[in-house]
């Protein structure tokens, strides 16, 4: 009984073994049928020896059973060769090699790598010795083979690396081998359709019929099995293609595909098959279809309504913009008149007290900066209710008292001292400070005639030095520096504040206008009552008044000037070009020779209200006049003006230059660009200037902004007339032909 059971178990095991062997052999036969050798593959007689010795491998996954560490050194393999196959209409390769006798007894298996230029398509085979489990020296001539590497491209280069294991050597120690797969014709045959995927039609004709395109092409051979053709078309400047599917006509060798309602233009047309392998492309220009109604009548019917509509639209736009501008400016004018009337009423009801303000500024930053200063002073006086002291408005007072006396008195009387800091002010103040010329002796002395233009233009440097000294004194005694203020406009920077004035509070205008206004009206004055504050003082509404609007335009013009000319200060510092000197030739037959003319500056007591001096010469054809000016007698002051001197302008034709007439300018005309706007008449000066500063008022009120240059106010720096003496060295001059000096008062 027990024997029969053992016999049954033996038969069952035998059946299972036979079934497993049959299935394995069937799988191997299937792989053999799937990947077949072609002509040109490499063979070797060593395969028979390998089968006799019974060398078989167990194939495993590379990523699972990989232990790279070993204790012995195994040398690289020898005699690497390749066999080319075809698997599923693709190229395949089998790798062959021989083990090296050095370290062959330690080999447990091999790893075979195959990769192309793309590292992501790397293939690997892990071969473990199955029978025998260990090699010896007699296996050195046995050729070993890998499984086929399939899914390879035709005529492509690959790299193969064979690494025996286990070993302590890295994979890079074993040198690679290179191979190139065979072509499709060699592996599959020249008649195989896989080797000819790029069939192109011999004919691709395009014609236009109305607004349709007719595309005609021939069919591919029936062996390709194309069931449908794809026609892609698009305008050349468009992005993606549009698709038209065309079924081949069974009755003929050609097929016509119609593209309906195409717009005029140049089209790119491409024919493809259903596998997207067959392509042929062409271009065709679709012309405009002319209808019977096309022509001049159609053009006029389209153009005339468009022109009429455009004209109405333009007229409507212009009228709307004009109306909008009128509303804006009328609103501004109403607010301006209300503000002016309110300020006038406040001044009439409570004319005193008004904070006295002294403004120190740089007179060397150009005419546009001077326009900003005058507008700012007028704004403080008109809108902010302050009494402003500005040298441009008090030329007569300066002539009477002298520059230093007037400067000291105005600084002492002022409740607030405002320094308008700019790029030029910092440059000249710190330049004078570095040179050490701003000494107390130079500050306290009266300017002489030889200082003329430089001392007059550098008055702000002396004023800055005095303000700096007073600021230091107040800072040492107490911390209340509210009397001193350093302001700068948006075309300047905080770094433009000189170091000597850094202790004073700083304000950026017009961003910090409310803080400045509060500072001007918050100081507790020694007077009984104070003037009410104008409401709603801010950066957004200060230009509602005339003075604020003038200040806004002046700041805008200066800001535009700084933006367009970043090196504007360097241009202002450049010396003016020398005028061309023209000498009057001396006539030999003249009876009168005027050798020299000396200009004598009178004292303050000898200063009648003289406006100009005129030198009149008789115009006789027989008498010639030679005029020579002594540069040593005139000195540097003869070419400029001073607080106590004036100079007549004598032209080469012998006539005196008339005084430059002040120019008046408009206020915010809606038809004038913003860059050409000007300051309005500054008629809101304080009452103390009405009786003795009428001339200064006219000068300040006629100062233009924008692109206009202000009038030369330096011509008013005069309180003393000039006495001209002529030495006559000829005795035959008739009394009626003498020199006539006329002084106009």
From Swiss-Prot:
The residues that cross the membrane are 299-319
Q: Which InterPro entries match?
A: IL-17_rcpt-like, IL17R_D_N, SEFIR_dom
The alphabetical list of record keywords is:
Glycoprotein, Membrane, Receptor, Signal, Transmembrane, Transmembrane helix
GO terms for CC? membrane
Translocase recorded as keyword: no
Glycosylation, residue list: 61, 79, 136, 170, 205, 276
Q: Name one GO molecular function term.
A: interleukin-17 receptor activity
Q: Which residues lie on this side of the membrane: Extracellular?
A: 27-298
Q: Where is the signal peptide?
A: 1-26
Q: Where is the composition biased (Low complexity)?
A: 693-705
SEFIR domain residues: 354-518
Q: Which intervals lie on the Cytoplasmic side per UniProt?
A: 320-745
Subcellular location(s) of the protein: Membrane
Indicate how the chain sits in the lipid bilayer. Single-pass type I membrane protein
Q: Where is the composition biased (Basic and acidic residues)?
A: 439-448
Q: Where is this region: Disordered?
A: 432-454, 631-713
> Do the record's keywords include Transit peptide?
no
Extract one GO BP annotation from the record: negative regulation of MAPK cascade
Q: What does this protein do?
A: Feedback inhibitor of fibroblast growth factor mediated Ras-MAPK signaling and ERK activation. May inhibit FGF-induced FGFR1 tyrosine phosphorylation.
How it assembles, according to the record, is: Interacts with fgfr1 and fgfr2.
The name under which this protein is listed is Interleukin-17 receptor D
| Gene from which this protein is expressed | il17rd
